[in-house]
């Protein structure tokens, strides 16, 4: 059995893609938490790859990564009573930073667990 067949065999559910309305709701929810980041193009890469290439520059996001969008959306979708208890995540990277910043901006207590190595 090949590696790809093994992976395919282990997939047990289908991913439900968000609808356009879901994306618009998320955009409205997180709007005050994120920077609007540019989309750039490269005519050099377009020619080499023979297609149009777009770069969404999420490195200009608050804390420097797209994770800010998901973290802030997750917090803002949570039940207000649950948020009073605070939030927690286990991450040593961009998601930890995004949860910490989103929580701070929302006045929510956050616990970030980071590995030692």
Language-model-detected regions and their locations in the chain:
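PLP-dependent amino-acid enzyme catalytic core
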Residues: 2-117
């Amino acid at each position: 059995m090949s590696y790809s067949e093994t992976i395919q065999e282990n997939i047990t559910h289908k991913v439900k893609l968000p609808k356009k309305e879901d994306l618009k709701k998320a955009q409205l929810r997180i709007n005050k938490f994120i920077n609007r980041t540019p989309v750039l193009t490269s005519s050099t890469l377009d020619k080499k790859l023979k297609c149009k290439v777009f770069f969404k520059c999420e490195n200009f996001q608050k804390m420097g990564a797209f994770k800010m969008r998901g973290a802030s959306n997750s917090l803002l979708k949570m039940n207000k009573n649950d948020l009073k208890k605070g939030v927690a995540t286990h991450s040593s990277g961009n998601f930890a930073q995004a949860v910490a910043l989103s929580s701070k901006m929302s006045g929510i207590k956050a616990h970030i667990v980071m590995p030692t190595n």
